[in-house]
């Protein structure tokens, strides 16, 4: 779950809804400067389903007693977080091997590249190690299988897999920034391009509500792009998790529309 603030207060957006936005961008991604990617449908599906492991938790989110609000994805305990990423593997595998591989690699990439373990407990470190060990074995099995498949072998090279993994990470980060409401300039480095080293995307909000954003250089096929998802208006704060969940179940839906342009 992520939080989006506007003039009326808090909007909560589920991780699967945010992932859908990542998938919307994936399907419109690519031009002369940023190139294409393959296998197109499988990579788009991985982007769209990369947070499939959150589905169960989002139905009964936990309460952050310090804030009085539902936990965001950044506030959950490590064992809870790694368990969700572990559950994503068998769920995403129902869609196929290639999307499952990218979903799993996205999860391990988050811990290997971005997680700060300096304050983790011994239990946290053990949970991370167990998760990474099992996930790498899962990935290796899929890679061996895909490399023996005539349809997928050319898409299972280290170069192609690495590029596709990075694209999913870029779309994830873009979607998080946009769904949380962009208030100030941001950038995303090392974005894969058609040729040469990756480029840096500059994101600039046009207004104060984060509903219109300029991106440079422009990475999409269309000259403009409209993204959509839904959140729920959740006013107030709670001390009781069950009451928070009851309020969330009856909270009004809020359509979110974000316009991207060069």
Task: Label every model-predicted segment.
Residues 2-13, 23-24, 42-155, 163-170, ...:
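Divalent metal-dependent catalytic cores for phosphoryl transfer on phosphate-bearing substrates
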Residues 7, 28, 32, 37, ...:
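Sparse, context-dependent recognition of short Cys/His-centered cofactor- or disulfide-binding micro-motifs
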Residues 11-41:
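Alpha-helical phosphate/pyrophosphate-handling elements in metalloenzyme active cores
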Residues 20, 29, 54-57, 85, ...:
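A residue-identity detector for tryptophan
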Residues 123-262:
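Non-catalytic terminal regions of proteins
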């Amino acid at each position: 779950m992520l939080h989006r603030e506007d003039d009326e207060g808090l909007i909560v957006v589920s991780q699967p809804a945010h992932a859908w936005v990542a998938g919307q961008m994936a399907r419109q991604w690519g031009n002369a400067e940023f190139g294409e990617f393959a296998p197109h449908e499988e990579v788009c599906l991985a982007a769209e389903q990369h947070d499939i492991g959150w589905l169960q938790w989002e139905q009964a989110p936990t309460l952050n007693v310090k804030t009085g609000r539902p936990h965001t994805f950044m506030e959950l305990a490590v064992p809870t977080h790694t368990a969700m990423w572990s559950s994503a593997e068998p769920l995403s595998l129902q869609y196929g091997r290639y999307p499952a591989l990218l979903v799993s690699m996205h999860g391990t990439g988050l811990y290997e590249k971005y997680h700060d373990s300096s304050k983790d407990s011994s239990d946290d470190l053990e949970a991370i190690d167990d998760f990474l060990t099992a996930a790498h074995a899962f990935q290796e099995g899929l890679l061996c299988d895909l490399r023996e498949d005539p349809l997928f072998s050319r898409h299972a090279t280290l170069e192609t897999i690495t590029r596709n993994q990075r694209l999913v990470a870029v779309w994830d980060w873009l979607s998080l920034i946009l769904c949380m409401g962009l208030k100030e300039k941001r950038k995303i480095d090392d974005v894969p391009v058609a040729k040469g080293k990756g480029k840096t995307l500059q994101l600039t909000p046009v207004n104060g509500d984060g509903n219109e954003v300029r991106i440079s250089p422009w990475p999409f096929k269309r000259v403009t792009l409209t993204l959509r998802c839904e959140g729920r208006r959740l006013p107030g704060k709670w001390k009781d998790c069950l009451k928070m969940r009851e309020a969330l179940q009856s909270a009004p839906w809020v359509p979110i529309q974000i316009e991207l342009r060069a």
